[in-house]
Amino acid sequence: EYLDNGVVKSRSKKVPKISYYGCYNVAETLNVVFKDFRIDLGLGGLHGAKKGTIKESETHSIMSYDVASMYPNIAITNRVYPEHLGESFCDSYEDFYNERKKFSKGTPENLAIKLGLNSVYGKSNDKYSPFLDPMYTMKITINGQLSLCMLMEQIVLQCNARLIMANTDGFEFYIEKSKEDLAKSIVADWEKTVGLQMELVMYKAMYIKDVNNYVSVYED
């Protein structure tokens, strides 16, 4: 309240004003069920698994797709950055990502840079980290989860495939061998749409207790 002499006087209100923020942590158990497969969505990514044993047969195969460096590439492709660091963060992050490509997979150098790249996402939700920006965290994880859900839906509906497991940056499904090429085509179109790259692995069998306890047998 302003008085005639220009002095500001405080005034108490009968009904206190309350602001709500940070509500992204309210939903602790968000999930969807699609074709009898439950997908749990959360800050740590999407998760889901069908308990049991699944084996390759004469007519069906097990395909596993994994997003290459999902969290870093979502940030780089979509120009997502911690607000206080500015958009130049994306350029530096991309340079760091390209540096990793100079070293073969499995080498100490490659693994060290991979750890640094992925740590940015985790540290973006750490109050003691210079990367702290919860909005950045949510943009990355929601983008990744919805993008993967979109791809899983397309493969299940168009290929009549059955989801087996989904875990953070990838998923497995049981599919007729005659429809493998169709699935690969769907993935290729998805890659163009979202700007991410998928890595394919074929399994002979999967023995699943839950999303954190399973054994996969490679085809070769």
Residue map of PLM features:
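Conserved acidic
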Residues: 1-220
